[in-house]
Amino acid sequence: MSDQQQPPVYKIALGIEYDGSKYYGWQRQNEVRSVQEKLEKALSQVANEPITVFCAGRTDAGVHGTGQVVHFETTAQRKDAAWTLGVNANLPGDIAVRWVKAVPDDFHARFSATARRYRYIIYNHRLRPAVLSKGVTHFYEPLDAERMHRAAQCLLGENDFTSFRAVQCQSRTPWRNVMHINVTRHGPYVVVDIKANAFVHHMVRNIVGSLMEVGAHNQPESWIAELLAAKDRTLAAATAKAEGLYLVAVDYPDRYDLPKPPMGPLFLAD
């Protein structure tokens, strides 16, 4: 008797949006809420088999995503609406699938990515916000966004980011390639937009923490360049809070033809 034929395996990519304020980060962990665990549970219900997802970037506790990308493999053959509307019906309100795309075998959400982009949102006002309290970081001292932008330009290109790297970072190298970093003001909001090939642990939040010191005129514009050259985390400012940080986009080679929805968050244009 011939062996039973194995069902075909499909590889699917999804775009995911989430409010990370009630989660202990992206990665599945025992006994605490994670975005990965909720997504895998919802996908498994739709697929009627256990699903494991792989993501482009494992965000920390309290960090949000508008442009997270994941992939998974399944023998379940479903219409696109099942992987979007169907999965969303099984997800909590603070996690949502934005798009679905069948991808070839060589695609990997993490290893195929060529760049990641983050936006950090500062609510720069004397009084704290209420409605967006978990979606922005409040900073009450007046910030000079143009000064912050000028100071940040020394971070462009390939550099050793030891001064902006968490002590517990497990990456083999502190070197990263920053493609752009822009600081702009939108009314009471100051936005730090940074894109790099990859990021060391807490890199964006550590950079923002130091840029806020420059923006508040507590440090000179030259301080960021001095920190970069010093390669000493203890000299830089405290890590900025998680609430204001969003993973907004992940770049992949054009041949995968993945959707590119608006990055956001909220009012921010691409």
From Swiss-Prot:
Protein name (Swiss-Prot/TrEMBL): tRNA pseudouridine synthase A
Binding site for substrate: 118
UniProt function note: Formation of pseudouridine at positions 38, 39 and 40 in the anticodon stem and loop of transfer RNAs.
Record HAMAP family: TruA
Stretches of the chain forming a coiled coil according to its record: none
Any one GO MF annotation of this record: tRNA pseudouridine(38-40) synthase activity
Organism name: Escherichia coli (strain 55989 / EAEC)
Taxonomic placement: Bacteria, Pseudomonadati, Pseudomonadota, Gammaproteobacteria, Enterobacterales
UniProt-annotated catalytic positions: 60
InterPro entries attached to this UniProt entry: PsdUridine_synth_cat_dom_sf, PsdUridine_synth_TruA, PsdUridine_synth_TruA_a/b_dom, PsdUridine_synth_TruA_C, TruA/RsuA/RluB/E/F_N
